Regions:
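Short, glycine-anchored, charge-dense loop/turn motifs used at functional sites
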Residues: 6, 103-111, 238-247
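Active-site-proximal beta-strand elements of phosphoester/diester hydrolases
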Residues: 3-13, 100, 113, 140, ...
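Residue-level detector of high-confidence beta-strand sites
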Residues: 100, 113-115, 249, 259
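CN hydrolase (nitrilase-like) catalytic-core segments centered on the catalytic cysteine
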Residues: 62-85, 147, 153-257
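Cys-nucleophile CN-hydrolase/nitrilase-fold catalytic domain and related Cys-dependent amidase chemistry
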Residues: 17, 26-106, 110-113, 179-203, ...
């Protein structure tokens, strides 16, 4: 067995960014105290989910990488001796911004980053206004605790993204996330959507024989314009083993931390029994898989 202890931080956020960061730092410390070697945070964790409406001035929230957040969290990672997965609003250059996951090594250095590839543009999720699609492909990030296939939120609905990370050598899939129910959907539909959200990621776990770590935010965040009822984030952060089995799960409204043990050697055992990679017919898929809309 090759056990990796992974910490997950699920929390709500407010408009007070310094307070959000202090809350995150406290929860990261709690994970470390519980033995976590790797800690994963939610999508855009420093602030509220600002993409509920379009406002150019909100681009002032973006920061360079490396920058203030990588310095702050890097110092904490070095102090605690942990690997840390961040999710930041990256300012690449004037007018070009990305939704970027950053992996911090135990020594506080940047191990690598991933720019979100799939960008939504739906009611309350107007991300295309803020984020340029990623241009770094689906390359896992090498760290002292393993090879991490880091993706971001909307990427989690696409089996191609998970498969690319798996084929490129990821030992686990990690999804910082900000997703919840919006005013246009009845409560019953939101429950169906929430279950589907978890189910599709458990499917990626099964299809690729990899553990999945998904960290979502929780709480109600109002629409600053008052035009909608805002978003009630689902919470439900979870971890699976390589057969999609649930190892840990937060409640919808639960705030705090969980530390889960992941056996990185189990992928070998599972893939021997379910040799999906062996039986793929890459000779037969041809250009069909490249079609955008099908027939």
């Amino acid at each position: 067995m090759n056990i990796l202890k992974v910490g997950m931080v699920q929390q709500s956020c407010s408009n007070d960014i310094p307070a959000n960061i202090e809350k995150l730092k406290s929860n990261i410390r709690k994970c470390a105290e519980l033995g976590a070697q790797l800690v994963v945070l939610q999508e855009l964790h420093n602030s509220v989910y600002f993409c509920q409406h379009e406002e150019a001035a909100l681009c002032d929230l973006a920061e360079p990488i490396p920058g203030p957040s990588t310095e702050t969290y890097g110092a904490l990672a070095k102090e605690l001796g942990i690997v840390l997965v961040l999710s930041l609003f990256e300012r690449r250059t004037a007018g070009i911004y990305h939704n970027t996951a950053v992996v911090i090594e135990k020594d506080g250095s940047i191990a690598g980053k991933y720019r979100k590839m799939h960008i939504p543009d739906d009611p309350c999720y107007y991300e295309k206004f803020y984020f340029t699609p990623g241009d770094m492909g689906f390359q896992p990030i090498e760290t002292s605790v393993g090879t991490l296939g880091v993706l971001v939120c909307w990427d989690q609905w696409y089996p191609e993204a998970a498969r690319c990370m798996a084929l490129n050598g990821a030992q686990m899939l990690i999804y910082p996330t900000a997703i919840g129910g919006v005013y246009t959907d009845p409560v019953e539909e939101q429950k169906v959507q929430s279950d589907a959200w978890q189910l599709v990621q458990r499917g990626h776990s099964v299809a690729n024989g990899l553990p999945v770590i998904t960290v979502n935010r929780t709480g109600q965040e109002d629409d600053p314009t008052g035009n909608t009822k805002g978003i009630k984030f689902w919470g439900r952060s979870f971890a699976t083993g390589p057969q999609g089995e649930l190892l840990a799960e937060f409640g919808n409204d639960e705030e705090g931390v969980k530390v889960v043990e992941i056996d990185l050697d189990r992928t070998e055992y599972v893939r021997r029994g379910w040799p999906f990679f062996r039986d793929r017919r890459i000779d037969a898929y041809g250009e069909t898989i490249l079609k955008r809309y099908g027939k």
